[in-house]
Amino acid sequence: IPSWYWEGDAVDVETAFSNSGRGRVPYFDILTRSLILSGSKPSYRQVLFGSYKNKYPDHYEMGFMLTRHIKSQYNVNSINEILTKTLKWPFLLNPLAPFSRSVYKTLNSNISDIYSDALYDKRALWEKLVIEIEEDSVTNISPNQENWTDYKFPSPSINGSLIALKSGVATLPTIVRVKDGIEEKIHELSSSIEIFGFHSNGRQVVWSYYSPDKRWSKESWANIQILDLSTNQIKDISTKKMYYHPSLSKNGNYIVASSFSKERNSLLTIIDARTGKVNDRVLPPDNGIIMEPSWSDDAKDIVFILQNDQGRSMYIYNRLKRTFLKIKDSSWEDIFRPVFYNNYVLFESPYKGIDNILAINLEDSQEYLLTNRKLGAYYPALKDSTTLLFSNYTSNGEQIVSKKINTDKWKPISKVRFDPVRFYQPPYHELNLNDNYEEQPDKKYNVENYSHFSNFFNIHSRYIFNDMFDPSFGIQSDNILGTASLSADISYNQKEDVFKKRIGLSYLKYYPIVNFDL
């Protein structure tokens, strides 16, 4: 069974039964949109197996498109029927391709044709929508590339150059300096950087990176490093911390980041960029999770996104007064990456199904549309007081562009926005799922101290290896905390006509692992 089946169905279910599933986020299927709007027609097998040259949708994105198409065009129960037929005597009915056979038996169509139909429907939908979009005028800055290349997190630097994070199909995230269409490689980073956070103030670069513990596999950290662009020296700011989305102040004195306590509370944390000392740490309002904090030019205010069970909102924190001000109410709008601009805050947000750069007026809360792109605009930054930088999504990756800012030409938009593509009626209304839910009584569980020694053994499995020359039978024990593991088996060597007994014990509670085999 291909992985797109499981993951696509999972995405579809979370999208249908939540307000913030991945299927409602424009960036989730943007690669598929970029391919179909550019006229590209990759086959099912090309997308299924991927490429080292071209970038294709992963199994999440392709799976969501296929499973949603099957449920909408055939029957919501078709997905379950395909699975049932696949797992029922697969080696007798079709030992080579049980899944493909089940798809054809259930839908009377093969999977390649279903993929082509889904792609055709998606193309027809988006071509109709984007034909009405008149894209705004922008100036290309990043170098043209033959293969798929992304330039993210653009920020102005010295002598008219830009700092950005470059990545591609065969390229690790790399800090580059771009000027006059020519790029200079500065430093390669790990692939976790794009998720954990990256920012530059033009003279320095800061990022958060994944740092696993050398011994405890379930313990890991997100630490901060800072790079001085004038010397190319890297400095560790933290060790064994959990810092995400770090941002440097313009003067380079402070770093603000989202951190987490051991109680899993999200904290707005201000750090001295030279010493790594924490200057301030504060809980946000409404028990939310802090995302993408960003400094004002004078380093007095910090704007950030807050996410909780009511959706996402936007706040400003005053560093000197230690006060919060809500500037955008909670909603399920997928807002992201706020930055200050005069008396406005610029941010990413979906508008009619496409991510664009918006602005909110800090005086009257009126919102404006700054960009109008057919695929998406991301990573807003200010080159100067009259020029906006952002990453423009194209059929060949995210490219850095600039656009002149003229507040007189900004288009006011409603705070309540309807997405004609993603605010759909899911097909699950046919199943009357609410009728199947039963009220579950409250149950109290006894809380007791865990005894490590009385729970040392926990036999949970037995196994038989029916090897022709060396059949064996054994048992496996692992305690609940995973600190003790026992395996024991007996096997018979037919050639030598002898039984072989083996027992193995591993004790993992302390730093050195103790192994015993007999």
Feature locations, PLM:
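Beta/coil-rich, acidic/histidine-enriched accessory regions frequently appended to metallopeptidases
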Residues: 54-57, 81-197, 202, 229, ...
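Outer-membrane beta-barrel initiation region
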Residues: 147-149, 153, 349, 406-517
